[in-house]
Design a protein with these regions (language model features):
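Bacterial N-terminal signal peptides
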Residues: 6-16
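Short S/T/G/P-rich N-terminal loop/turn motif that feeds into the first structured element of a domain
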Residues: 18-200, 204-226
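Positively charged n-region of N-terminal signal peptides that target proteins for export
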Residues: 1-4
């Protein structure tokens, strides 16, 4: 099943050790290099899957940033993938590096990299686009932020959304809503904006002391999926 893992080493000890985990790398694409970046990452994904055993998703957001997501069954599999990458000198890997030599300016530059714990996966095979909201939890409030996010899942999915939630070790919680296309997403937004259930849930949370702040919204189109 295709899975989109929204943008998250967090809850390493508080979540189940069997939870799926992963690594997210964000690459800022040089202006005018979008097609080259897409071609390079599309070609590289199956090579990395073969070497590391990870399920890989790759997408691009509205900021021309590549989201490269490697997902593993658990932390042991994550560690084995890292060991394999460090030890592997396959011909395919070498050929790919040779095909895409360094350029000036570079095609893309690494902007961020972090580990994830998946709290909830989405349930669709047609998650081609995602709206991802990054919530920065106040100190000591990450668990509460996750609990609040989980309250929205049945409400949003009842309206046709497909939700994934993940978290990192910096207090961030990522809430991703995925659809087959942008038109479906737009229709869902209109329905959600008019929903009394959504409004009621927001109202109940707004009566409490805020535990997190929405700091970024990513609109991602996925062009590589497992």
């Amino acid at each position: 099943m295709k899975k989109i893992y929204a943008l998250a080493f967090s809850l390493l000890f508080t979540l189940s050790a069997a939870a799926e985990v992963g690594t997210v790398s964000l690459w800022q694409v040089t202006p005018g290099k979008n097609q080259e970046a897409i071609a390079r990452t599309t070609a590289f994904a199956p090579i990395m899957e073969e070497i590391t055993g990870a399920q890989i998703s790759v997408g691009m957001d509205q900021f021309n940033t590549i989201h490269w997501v490697q997902v593993y069954e658990d932390w042991e599999a994550w560690g084995k993938g890292g060991d394999a990458l460090g030890q592997n000198n396959s011909e395919k890997f070498a050929e790919h590096i040779a095909k895409y030599p360094r350029t000036t300016p570079p095609i893309m530059t690494l902007a961020d990299r972090f580990e994830l714990n998946l709290v909830k996966m989405n349930s669709t095979d047609n998650a081609n686009v995602s709206w991802i909201t990054q919530w920065d939890s106040r100190q000591g409030q990450q668990q509460t932020t996750i609990a609040n996010a989980m309250q929205f899942v049945p409400v949003h999915e009842k309206l046709g959304g497909n939700i994934a939630i993940s978290a990192d070790n910096l207090g961030n919680v990522y809430y991703a809503n995925s659809f087959e296309n942008w038109a479906d997403m737009g229709r869902w937004i209109e329905v959600a904006n008019a929903s009394k259930d959504v409004a009621t849930l927001w109202a109940s949370l707004l009566t409490e002391e805020p535990v997190a702040e929405a700091v970024k919204h990513y609109r991602v189109r996925w062009f590589v999926q497992p």
